[in-house]
A protein has these predicted regions:
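Aromatic- and Gly/Pro-rich amphipathic surface segment
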Residues: 76-98
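Short beta-strand segments of immunoglobulin-like
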Residues: 217-222
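Short coil-to-beta-strand transition motifs
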Residues: 54-58, 102-105
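Predominantly extracellular/luminal regions of secreted and cell-surface proteins
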Residues: 61-84
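Bacterial Sec-dependent N-terminal signal peptides
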Residues: 1-21
């Protein structure tokens, strides 16, 4: 009983600590719902309307971040960013711009539930703007280009046998200096031209799947 109470107190303390470390970066385009954002429970719903799976783990929340010159590797992280809000946004807690000559780095640790043993583990990103490289335990597990499309990576072979796993994501977004569709996003916003959206901006999650599993569902009419 005492052990259960201690665990509950420690969990509550950690949640309070995380909340205290994060705050919006200014009041830019802030709505009444911004006050409800909690770093310990960010967009908790299953993010994919089709193919919802019973077992999954939400990786939204506070990650470490760094902004470096393009091609450089961070020697240390600058602080924490609230995923899945773009680094330029208020709710990210950062509110910084990333130039085409820079790259945005994310890092966090995660554990895999013991009940997933023997299954493939898929790492899913709802969207990352624009070009993303992903490593698990210093093993590159994939790359994706495109700021509006979800993607999944099989990270099973890169996982540690037990304990923590390290996830690193590097993002490069040239915005209007690149070839990608970008709407009104520009590097120098003014008038009708808007601030860029860089990095992870949709939910990140992982889930176990069988060796043979459904990857996509297409519906067609008669």
């Amino acid at each position: 009983m005492k052990k259960s109470i201690l665990i509950a107190v420690l969990t509550a303390s950690m949640a309070t600590s995380a909340f205290a470390q994060w705050k919006p970066a200014g009041d830019k385009i802030k709505t009444k719902w911004a006050e409800q954002v909690n770093p310990e429970n960010v967009l908790p719903e299953y993010p994919r309307p089709v193919m919802e799976r019973g077992e999954w783990k939400n990786l939204n929340g506070l990650w470490n971040y760094a902004i470096t010159e393009k091609g450089a590797v961070p020697s240390a992280y600058e602080g924490q960013i609230l995923v899945p809000f773009a680094v330029e946004s208020s709710l990210s807690g950062v509110g910084k711009k990333v130039s085409p000559d820079e790259e945005l780095w994310y890092q966090r640790n995660f554990t895999v539930p013991a009940t997933w043993k023997g299954k493939k583990v898929m790492l899913n990103f709802g969207a990352v703007d624009w070009k993303a490289d992903i490593w698990v335990n210093d093993i590159k597990v994939g790359q994706h280009t495109g700021g509006f499309t979800p993607f999944s990576l099989d990270i099973t072979a890169a996982l540690a046998a037990k304990g923590d796993n390290k996830l690193v994501v590097k993002v490069w977004d040239p915005t209007d200096r690149g070839p990608q569709p970008r709407g009104k996003q520009v590097n120098r916003p003014e008038g009708i031209w808007y601030t860029a959206v860089t990095g992870i901006w949709q939910t990140v999650w992982m889930e176990p799947v069988a060796e043979r599993h459904i990857t996509i569902v297409r519906t067609s009419s008669d």
